[in-house]
Amino acid sequence: MAGHDVQYGKHRTRRSFSRIKEVLDLPNLIEIQTDSFKAFLDHGLKEVFEDVLPISNFTDTMELEFVGYEIKEPKYTLEEARIHDASYSAPIFVTFRLINKETGEIKTQEVFFGDFPIMTEMGTFIINGGERIIVSQLVRSPGVYFNDKVDKNGKVGYGSTVIPNRGAWLELESDSKDITYTRIDRTRKIPFTTLVRALGFSGDDEIFDIFGDSELVRNTVEKDIHKNPMDSRTDEALKEIYERLRPGEPKTAESSRSLLVARFFDPRRYDLAAVGRYKINKKLNVKTRLLNQTIAEPLVDPETGEILVEAGTIMTRSVIESIESHLDGDLNKIVYIPNDAAVVTEPVVLQKFKVIAPTDPDRVVTIIGNANPDDKVRTVTPADILAEMSYFLNLAEGLGRVDDIDHLGNRRIRAVGELLANQVRLGLSRMERNVRERMSVQDNEVLTPQQIINIRPVTAAVKEFFGSSQLSQFMDQHNPLSELSHKRRLSALGPGGLTRDRAGYEVRDVHYTHYGRMCPIETPEGPNIGLINNLSSYGHLNKYGFVQTPYRKVDRETGVVTNEIVWLTADEEDEYTVAQANSRLNEDGTFAEKIVMGRHQGVNQEYPANIVDYMDVSPKQVVAVATACIPFLENDDSNRALMGANMQRQAVPLINPQAPYVGTGMEYQAAHDSGAAVIAQYDGKVTYADADKVEVRREDGSLDVYHIQKFRRSNSGTAYNQRTLVKVGDVVEKGDFIADGPSMENGEMALGQNPIVAYMTWEGYNFEDAVIMSERLVKDDVYTSVHLEEYESETRDTKLGPEEITREIPNVGEDALKDLDEMGIIRIGAEVKEGDILVGKVTPKGEKDLSAEERLLHAIFGDKSREVRDTSLRVPHGADGVVRDVKIFTRVNGDELQSGVNMLVRVYIAQKRKIKVGDKMAGRHGNKGVVSRIVPVEDMPYLPDGTPVDIMLNPLGVPSRMNIGQVMELHLGMAARTLGIHIATPVFDGASSEDLWSTVKEAGMDSDAKTILYDGRTGEPFDNRVSVGVMYMIKLHHMVDDKLHARSVGPYSTVTQQPLGGKAQFGGQRFGEMEVWALEAYGASNVLQEILTYKSDDINGRLKAYEAITKGKPIPKPGVPESFRVLVKELQSLGLDMRVLDEDDQEVELRDLDEGMDEDVIHVDDLEKAREKAAQEAKAAFEAEEAEKATKAEATEEAAEQE
């Protein structure tokens, strides 16, 4: 027998084919969320308060200090927050101290600082009743970056930028004439020596002394001449900088000094953050810059005078390690004193070394280090600026190297805690202005912290972040895997990140540093590809937000691969050679081969075993959780694997799911950590268990009660249902499953089912990836899922009186009310169809809502009582089902409702959806298709033992897609079904072909793993042998019920009067430009005319056509489309006198905006007016006629007389 048995939890054993022993268990998969939020509550929030406070008033007589804060118990429990549409948050109280410096009086007071959303154990937040996730953001790390660029003449120039966490950028660049310039905050450039002079080193000789002699320095000094002898060089430099930063303002040296201090050296305006300081010290440190260079002068210990390194020595890693303590100490430290006019007058400490230029052995190059300022220094220092300039000048001499901004050593992750801290900081800095003004305006004697603090800006900032930030997302709750993936997602988008349009190919591409940190496979298809990534399975954040991955340390002396685990970030890993996890080892832990496959700085090749420093801990450390759930991933093309990983996240939870026969061993861990299952918090013994709760008695006698969720609606409208797994008397340990969540079986993730699949064509029904399915899957509810939809109705106060929820609905028969209770609300358990009333509701009717007849009746009988119209909540199209639950919220019961709302009723309708033609199915290898035909069981092909096949797939879907993993899974699945076992074949360490064939043989299958199939309709065998086996197939969330849609009479767009589009708007089908071309090509003029008029936006035409159809008359000619009129009016509004003429050059009258709206409807008053008007018109016409007759008579008389 190939493989060995492995136990997953207490309920499942799998035969595993892995050969590599795992030395490290997977970490908790949602720790990126939970650890970050915990760190925020423990110290992040405190740091933010300490950053902004203390606040002094303008005269510096009063000061507000921060003392501490306390988070109290949440107002609602998790469940209550969900039900009441509230947020799961806890009140936070902050203690402040207000000090009056004149009198010495101190007032300490605790101030309520708003409700702060609290993370649940599952790593989510509940905001306004909806479960949300804060996605971690991938951003460029603060620090100093060097880049190279080639100009049009092929000359290489360099550039450098200091990027802070917040504050002004400082850039260096060289031009084609080899002059070096600096830019401050993206303004115009100035020679870099100008900035050096402003820092207090004004003489040319001083500049050469600091940087050494080089062509770039010489050219720049020549360019930077002393223009105004009245000013000192430093003052002149300061004025020149001020002119660049504030053009047009009067420039003085003093204002320039204060401006530069504010821009770079004031911790409130400029912040590198801990990570920026770490990155700058790492980049500008002399240790890394001296590596492999030849030293040009002896290095002497300043205390003892002992020569540590002779001149001419090559500084290898071992040499540098031997003098590391001296390099970190005072070796070659030089103190420069700036002149008195400088921006910062403190002495500048630099570390200075001379090395032989790599390009020219006769030249000596100066290297300047920043002497490692302390971690507490969060602004840039003059030493940093000078060291950056030195590094920049060294690049031209062939020392140092440029940075790759897509390297994960230069990109870091802002997780929840940091994103929240930034929001609070934003709110506090807005509050600070407010506080300062109130301190200055009000009387000092009576002020208390409570009076001067307005918490509105802080709570608003936090609320806005959770409610509407791009990174605060509605949780993807299709199934446990999609929840887990969402929590581990890394987005490069969002505030302070990239935008889709600007992100180029390089940012999106897979980088060699992604190995073990970010998954190279799981990313969306489409515009976000490569911008949204997933953390790899072992990935972990360090304190600076860089992703680390674990490696086993190799002992260089003995060559033994130890079990000591070292976590490395991407830039640390660059210094070492790492062997792959599948390198063969001897019993004693040494490498079995002299040459092993390994990686060094992104180069994958064979390395001698004796130079390897580390080894991967596991083959699956490369990929994310969803990708690690694909068996035989190593046999799939990466594009299809990407689809497979993404589609597993869209699986719909089924009624009775099955774990896959062929898994990867990842199913248990994914289900355990997803947060969808109920997990034991402590050891104990089960004392009570039913479908709704489980009670566990701990060793110390205390009782834990676990509540089981039944058929709750998830964010994506599926049923979130948990099933108890334990019985009374069971002993549970901490971390054991107490109940399965949705899409789980026996503590393992179970997204789909294990049907018998045959690769064969059948009557052409599986053309283009379509899926043919047996009716058994419908009858036995194999792919049936439950969906819950929520509908709500609220009563408001209107101008004409309050709306009411009632059974008394006008013009509705008793039959429609049969399932409503005495209040007019549907009973739980009622079966409802489209159009049925869920909540009976009436709204008072205004006078203007009444028809002419009703007004007449009111005028005669004075009956005002039934002036209501029916505004009941009815079942929308396609939402038939069973009423699962009804929730009623009223002000009387103390529920918080929006203003103006008196009562809110929510009705939940459950639907059982069986699989049907048009639903989308998929395997785990990116093999997706739509169900094209459901065939009766008796017509399906059957195996020699009489078992009918469940699903038929097209064999042509395999070769061109290159996802051969599905075929391996098929054969192994059949063997597993025959043997009655479950199998684990971990990614990159799974079953080999030998394992596969030996298992097939063990199961007694034929040697080619194919079989004879018989046609179910005729009983004849098919000509060729067919591959039949068990493949794990899932039903995806794209169901035909949600997509099928037809419009009859529906809404029109206001401006163009064309039908709306889309199912949600009950819209029509767009007949676009190309479709019009098709009709034109066929010469179908009448069809074309009616599509562009009646069926679209000819308002009068469509009314008349409707009337004609209903009355059975011929349809009249169409009129002018509304959108044409809109175009004419638009052109007229631009001042073009545009008119429409007919063939006789007569102007065609276009309908005016106010015409033609309500021509048939007429009110009683208008009727009276119309009658009067008609009478007057008739009278006037009569009089005119009489007058005409009289004139005619006169005319005839006159004519007679003349004769």
UniProtKB/Swiss-Prot annotation:
InterPro entries: DNA-dir_RNA_pol_bsu_ext_1_sf, DNA-dir_RNA_pol_bsu_external_1, DNA-dir_RNA_pol_su2, DNA-dir_RNAP_su2_dom, DNA-dir_RNAP_su2_hyb_sf, RNA_pol_bsu_bac, RNA_pol_bsu_CS, RNA_pol_bsu_protrusion. GO terms for biological process: DNA-templated transcription. Its EC number is 2.7.7.6. It comes from the Bacteria. Transmembrane segments: none annotated. Residues 1174-1203 are annotated as: Disordered. One of its GO terms (molecular function) is DNA-directed RNA polymerase activity. It catalyses: RNA(n) + a ribonucleoside 5'-triphosphate = RNA(n+1) + diphosphate. GO terms for cellular component: DNA-directed RNA polymerase complex. HAMAP family: RNApol_bact_RpoB (MF_01321). DNA-dependent RNA polymerase catalyzes the transcription of DNA into RNA using the four ribonucleoside triphosphates as substrates. The RNAP catalytic core consists of 2 alpha, 1 beta, 1 beta' and 1 omega subunit. When a sigma factor is associated with the core the holoenzyme is formed, which can initiate transcription. This is DNA-directed RNA polymerase subunit beta. It comes from Streptococcus pneumoniae (strain ATCC 700669 / Spain 23F-1). The lineage of its organism: Bacteria, Bacillati, Bacillota, Bacilli, Lactobacillales.
